[in-house]
């Protein structure tokens, strides 16, 4: 992909800030639904998908709540609530449907380059956790969305599901796992690159090495963006609609826009590390994404998992994440990001959230100070035979947790102008996996007048659009069969 040359002043109907999975997804929607709209993208780095969307900067899990225990809460009476898990599963099905549509119609090619079938496993230790996992399994198994899920405490069965993790285990240790065959590993970096290749072919204007410095509302309702390129050349760009999809960099731009709903919003950055295996023999012994349970007092983003990944054309094995304390909102950001994001309008909210979350800050600082030996000790809870020399540390991406109303939010959130002319996506997990649902929310809230004429096309692209798949077993079966075939997941 090459930079677009442009004059000192320019215009587009739609402007996307940040060339990650969110902007790529919204761009694909609008290109299909409204091809007459001109589209411009501004990305401050030298290529698309280099920050949170990059394959080395996220876990690559197709988050559909098949194995992630933090999506199923155990209530005070001991029962397990699966509502959030069902919702996330439905949302991920929308992502699979859009990707299938884009492959089926030739918009993007070679699905095996960005998605693979991989079993998803939940793994716990101890009797109390085993009972929780069994209740979770029993609740989820009642839904056709989780059909085929299995549960076992038997060490021999567990050894078939995850042989690397069961080597040299104490035969008397209480263990339990749930297993489901049709999970996915998604290379969101490769998918992002494919999406932007498609957008450029459809005449979208991609501007790499261009930083948006300011956003202002004009009297005619348009937005004026001040943009600076790598050489320091300033440019003014006007647009009817602006989407800020710059990951951690979205918050400062949202604040500059001056929209009402963005004034009280703050952000708290969290960095991440993974251990990556460098021994091909060890990598070959594991073929699953195995999620554990966060330790008592640890935040939701700390759920440990041992992941088979497919990166740069080969199978990899990663363990983590290990969180860290940082002031940066982006991996290639500035230590001034957090301090300068605190404004008179969000000071009270950020301060209140900070006081409430002092244990989180303490946890992050402790995580940042871990030695390799301490990280290896955590890994050995999953892989008892893990050898120091087989594992290296890789720095992952940044996430910025949304602070709103004095509370820290752990999901993703769309903030928009009252008239729908500007929207920004903030937050983290489940992130890229539910990018399609997040961008559908943008379409619904920002293009309400045009939505009726898009209904037929949206239903063609997303057969479950407007329906709750939890109540549609036959439709779900049809969609799953099509998705598996088109995305080459059936074998």
Curated annotation (Swiss-Prot):
Naturally occurring in which organism (per UniProt): Actinobacillus pleuropneumoniae serotype 3 (strain JL03)
HAMAP family reported in the protein's UniProt record: MQO
GO BP terms, alphabetized: tricarboxylic acid cycle
Enzyme class: oxidoreductase
Annotated pathway: Carbohydrate metabolism; tricarboxylic acid cycle; oxaloacetate from (S)-malate (quinone route): step 1/1
Keywords, comma-separated and alphabetical: FAD, Flavoprotein, Oxidoreductase, Tricarboxylic acid cycle
Keyword Oxidoreductase attached: yes
GO molecular function: 2-hydroxyglutarate dehydrogenase activity; L-malate dehydrogenase (quinone) activity
Family of this protein: Belongs to the MQO family.
Source superkingdom: Bacteria
InterPro entries recorded: FAD/NAD-bd_sf, MQO
SUPFAM superfamilies hit by this protein: FAD/NAD(P)-binding domain
Record EC number: 1.1.5.4
Catalysis performed (reactions): (S)-malate + a quinone = a quinol + oxaloacetate
Cofactor(s) needed: FAD
Protein name: Probable malate:quinone oxidoreductase
